[in-house]
Regions:
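Short loop/turn segments at beta-alpha junctions that line or gate ligand-sensing/allosteric surfaces
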Residues: 154
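Charged, low-complexity intrinsically disordered terminal segments
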Residues: 2-148, 157-168, 174, 178-476
Length: 476
């Protein structure tokens, strides 16, 4: 018996060591930028600059957009898209929950599937396990015959050695006409009319007037097909047949009826073209689809575009960089006036990002950027890069090591002075709500800045966390 216990202890110890190596140490072996992708990005940049050179010679682009910064609007636009779907819906999301807004989306998807629309739902395995495994509403949707649900890198014994590779994408595709892409997850924190416990964020709605011929829509479709068929994506099977979920289907139907009463145009909205504006060009950039280490493709694309400008504004919830990423910031700041807007520690909703900023603040400033510590009413989850007055890069990518090397990420590179002006207006307000900290250490409070001091409990919490997170900052 003693020998058995000893052997079992050794086996468990070896297994834990292997898990630690695979999930903590191996992700430290960062992949480097590739020259092949650098050529692709350079071609993308050249194509965009050609559009800028002579607008008169460019045929009118079929892509029209609407920028969504309000959480309730974000829910309404999703419901409109789903409510007007005729053939097919694709929803890919990192964090879907069966809360008020999340169950509203489930209800809309069920209603669409019930009238014959084919629904494909792709969810990351972590939050599916945490928030949906026990949801009968979700299980009912899975059982619907016109719905197929797949899970990216599900939490199973077979996948225990790749826990840190997550799908961070957030997009919705409807038919061959439109998509919505941005930084919002599918839950009450990001969608709906709640006023507390929320994050501010941004989506881009793209409406295609050419019926499926838009470049960015085709790029997103191609990306979806690649990730949908990845090796570490598994089909979610229903526990029971549809008849078992009669009560849940009634609940979903009631939920959808309530949404139709509250938002009366979600099935008959027809002002897609009137409520959007034309853009010159949209290009999708991604980080790869594999559940494994990634090349820093999105950051490469951002750097390439930023180096063409004289002014660069980076909006990110937090900054967690390694040597290469600091080098990118320094290279950009040497060429352009570079501002980085991030949540102030006193306001940020992510304790890991806030803690790393306390540890790394001077390194960020040493790159030559000007930091803006934002004290917004709600934590800001938006991710955007503005280059001069015409280029906007919007999507799911945070300026951190997880987004750069571990997770799937999507960003839209949009050539549009109108969008740039719209986002810039928001960023200007954010900067007025911030404390400006220049690379030489000078500080200045914006006209709308509201000072807040961390209470003693939080100060103690961050003091302890600052020590703990150092070895794991590449995973935050």
């Amino acid at each position: 018996m003693k020998k058995f216990i000893k052997r079992l202890t050794i086996i468990i110890g070896l297994l834990l060591a292997a898990l630690f190596i695979a999930n903590v140490l191996f992700p430290c072996l960062y992949k480097h930028p590739t020259s092949e992708y650098a050529r692709e990005v350079s071609q993308m940049e050249e194509n965009i600059r050609e559009v800028q050179k002579d607008h008169a010679e460019v045929t009118e682009n079929s892509e029209r957009i609407y920028c969504i910064d309000d959480n309730e609007e974000a829910l309404i636009w999703r419901l409109r898209m789903i409510g007007n779907a005729k053939e097919r819906i694709v929803l890919a999301t990192f964090d879907l929950r069966a809360d008020d807004s999340g169950s509203g989306i489930l209800a809309a998807l069920y209603h669409a599937a019930d009238r014959g629309v084919q629904v494909q739902l792709l969810i990351d395995g972590i939050y599916q396990k945490l928030f949906l495994d026990g949801s009968k509403l979700f299980q009912a949707l899975v059982a619907q015959e016109n719905v197929e649900v797949r899970i990216y890198n599900p939490i199973t014994l077979m996948n225990m050695f790749r826990l840190n590779y997550r799908m961070h994408d957030k997009y919705l595709i409807v038919d061959d006409r439109m998509y919505l892409l941005g930084g919002r997850n599918t839950n009450d924190i990001f969608l709906g009319d709640k006023k507390t416990g929320i994050n501010a964020d941004r989506d881009i709605l793209m409406y295609d007037t050419s019926c499926g011929e838009s470049d960015s829509l085709l790029q997103l479709e191609d990306y979806f097909q690649r990730i949908w068929n990845e090796d570490h994506v598994s089909k979610k099977k229903s526990h029971h047949g549809q008849e078992y979920y009669a009560e849940q289907y009634d609940e979903l139907a009631e939920k959808y009826d309530a949404l139709k009463k509250k938002y009366t145009d979600i099935e008959n909205y027809d002002s897609w073209e009137a409520d959007t504006f034309a853009v010159d060009k949209i290009t999708l950039v991604d980080n790869g689809t594999q559940a494994g280490r990634k090349n820093p493709q999105v950051l490469q694309a951002i750097e390439t575009m930023a180096l063409q400008g004289e002014e660069v504004i980076i909006q990110t919830p937090y900054v967690i960089c390694n040597t290469y990423m600091y080098g990118v910031l320094e290279t950009i700041s040497q060429k352009a006036d570079t501002k980085v807007i991030l949540n102030a520690v006193e306001k940020g909703s992510n304790p890991w990002g806030c803690t790393d900023y306390l540890n790394q603040k001077q390194k960020i400033l040493d790159t030559g950027v000007t930091a803006y510590e934002l004290m917004n009413e709600h934590a800001v989850h938006s991710k955007a890069v503005l280059v001069d007055d015409d280029i906007s890069i919007v999507g799911s990518y945070n300026l951190d090591m997880r987004s750069t090397y571990l997770d799937t990420e999507l960003m839209l590179v949009i050539e549009s002075p109108e969008l740039n002006e719209q986002i810039r207006a928001t960023e200007n307000i954010y900067m007025e709500k911030s404390k400006e900290i220049r690379s030489d250490g000078q500080e200045k409070e914006g006209s709308l800045y509201e000072k807040k001091i961390l209470n003693q409990k939080k100060q103690m919490f961050y003091s302890v966390l600052r020590i703990f997170v150092r070895p794991f900052r590449h995973l935050l």
